[in-house]
A protein has these predicted regions:
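Surface-exposed, polar helix/loop patches in the mature regions of secreted/periplasmic/lumenal proteins
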Residues: 99-133
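Sec-dependent bacterial lipoprotein signal peptides
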Residues: 1-12
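N-terminal glycine/threonine-rich, aromatic-flanked beta-hairpin/loop signature
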Residues: 56-95
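C-terminal partner/receptor-binding element of secreted or periplasmic proteins
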Residues: 125-161
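Bacterial signal peptide processing site
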Residues: 14-17
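Tryptophan-anchored aromatic micro-motifs
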Residues: 27-59, 146-161
Length: 161
C-alpha cells in the first residue's frame, strides 16, 4: 500500500509546469522601482553614447543591434590604443570587431567591460605596453552627437560614419 501511494505521488507530479513568476509580484515591482531610481542598472538601456573612466574612452553611435564603436586608451608617452569598428548587441553581450581584432565584451546598462584577455590580432591597435584588455568604462552621456566627437590622440574621429 505504501508503495502504491508513493508511486501515485511521484506520477501526480509529472507533467506539471512550474509556476511562472508573476510580473506583478512584489519582487518584480521592487526590481522595476530600483531600475527607475537608478539603483540597479537597466540591462535594456541604450548602448549609444559616450563612455569613460580615467583615460579610457569609448563612443558608440547607431542602433542598439549594430553600431559604430570607437575606443581610445591614452597612457601618454606613446602608450595607448586607438580602434574604430562595429559592435553588435545581444542582451548583455557585445560582439566587437575592429578589423581582424574581434572579441566579446559585457554590457550591464551602466558599464562596458572588455575581457581580461584579448586576441593577438588586437595588439596592432596599441603602442608601447598598452592593451585593450580589461578596459572598463562607465556611461557619461546617451547623446549620439557627443559620441560622434570622440577623437584619437592623432585627431581622427572614432565614431564618424
Amino acid at each position: 500500500m505504501t508503495r502504491v501511494l508513493l508511486l501515485a505521488l511521484i506520477v501526480s507530479g509529472c507533467g506539471r509546469e512550474p509556476k511562472a513568476a508573476v510580473a506583478d509580484s512584489a519582487g518584480a515591482r521592487l526590481e522595476a522601482a530600483a531600475e527607475t531610481a537608478g539603483i540597479v542598472p537597466d540591462p535594456n538601456a541604450p548602448l549609444q553614447g559616450s563612455w569613460a573612466r580615467d583615460t579610457d574612452r569609448i563612443c558608440v553611435g547607431g542602433t542598439d543591434k549594430s553600431a559604430r564603436i570607437g575606443v581610445s586608451v591614452d597612457y601618454g608617452e606613446d602608450q595607448g590604443c586607438t580602434a574604430s569598428g562595429t559592435v553588435e548587441r545581444s542582451g548583455d553581450a557585445l560582439k566587437l570587431a575592429f578589423g581582424a581584432c574581434r572579441f566579446d565584451a559585457r554590457f550591464d546598462g551602466d558599464r562596458i567591460v572588455f575581457p581580461p584577455e584579448i586576441p593577438e590580432a588586437c595588439e596592432s591597435l596599441c603602442t608601447g605596453r598598452a592593451s585593450l584588455a580589461a578596459v572598463t568604462v562607465d556611461r557619461i552621456s546617451e547623446s549620439r552627437s557627443e559620441a560622434s566627437t570622440l577623437r584619437s590622440s592623432a585627431g581622427k574621429l572614432l565614431c564618424a560614419n
